[in-house]
Amino acid sequence: MTDWVRLTLPAALVASIASPALAVQYLSVEAAQKLAFPSANRFVEYDGKSWKAQAGDKLLGLFVLDHVIGKHLYIDYAVALDTNGRVMRVEILQYRESYGGEVRESSWLAQFVGKTSSSVLKVGGDIRTISGATLSSLHVTEGVKRVLANYGSHR
């Protein structure tokens, strides 16, 4: 066997087996805002990563953009809170891992609706674990809990 083959074959095998990370943007910030607050006619920036959703002069709630680490890479997500600090909606905007994307499923994200800063929010408790996306589901749950702790009393 030539030196060239002996040196490149192991690298080629590793490259063919390793799964690449896939960065997929599912929603823009603007699209997620409109999904969360369809009656809003403006979003006023609040602190650089959150916006007050308004219909005229009426405050509808707060839209918060955040990110957490999945297993190795960032997950960008958004949480919409009503004026009482309750979760109205959670959306995954961008998922970069090559597996574990089940955290995007609407049935899983719907578990957060109605939660407040006093909710337990525990994977394996009031939030289902996703087999194959254990760390992603854990970290998104922790992120939503952090958003509620920081913004849940924005009134």
Label each PLM-derived region with a short phrase:
Residues S19-R128, A133-L138, E142-R155:
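Flexible, solvent-exposed loop/hinge segments and secondary-structure transition points
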Residues T8-A18:
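Bacterial N-terminal signal peptides
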Residues M1-L9:
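Bacterial N-terminal signal peptides that target proteins for export
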